[in-house]
Amino acid sequence: WNPNLHRKALLKIVENEGAKNLSNLLINNKSKITKLLRSNLEFGQNIIKTDIKRIKEDLFKLKTKTQNIFENVDLILTPTTPQLASNIEKEQPLNQANFTSLANISDLPALSLPYNCTLEKPFSIQLNAANNNDKILLKISSIFEKILQ
């Protein structure tokens, strides 16, 4: 799993599918979508079909490998983000969704819990469980929640 690479790959799929689903807004220069959304959709529209196919195959392989991990473990525990919380008034780190994207790619139930620590800025952990194993995720996360407070 390469968090940065796989997050970017997933984003390409989202932008490509968004361009297809919002094509009526994209072709209408008078539509009220933001410049940033238009730019992202245009990027997605221009991704070559063979690249999309390859990306989907790569993400499917990751999904399969991730789901196989759950044959031996109940949960995957990671930080929610690769860094501590940032100031909302400043530009956000581009990699802030690197760890959360694994749940999206692999169809995993996931949740984040704040960690009440002595660090200067907030920190949280993310728990991922096997597909359709929400019950165990909620049960174990309630234990973590008590420990982290």
Tell what function each PLM region has.
Residues 1:
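Acidic-enriched catalytic cores of C-N bond-cleaving enzymes acting on peptides and small amides
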Residues 9-60, 67, 112-124:
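Short helix-loop capping/hinge segments that flank enzyme active sites or metal/cofactor-binding pockets
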Residues 10, 54, 83-101:
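Short, surface-exposed loop/helix-turn segments at secondary-structure junctions
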Residues 47, 53, 57, 105-149:
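Structural helix-boundary/capping segments
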Residues 80:
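Glycine-rich, N-terminal phosphate-binding loop of Rossmann-like dinucleotide-binding domains
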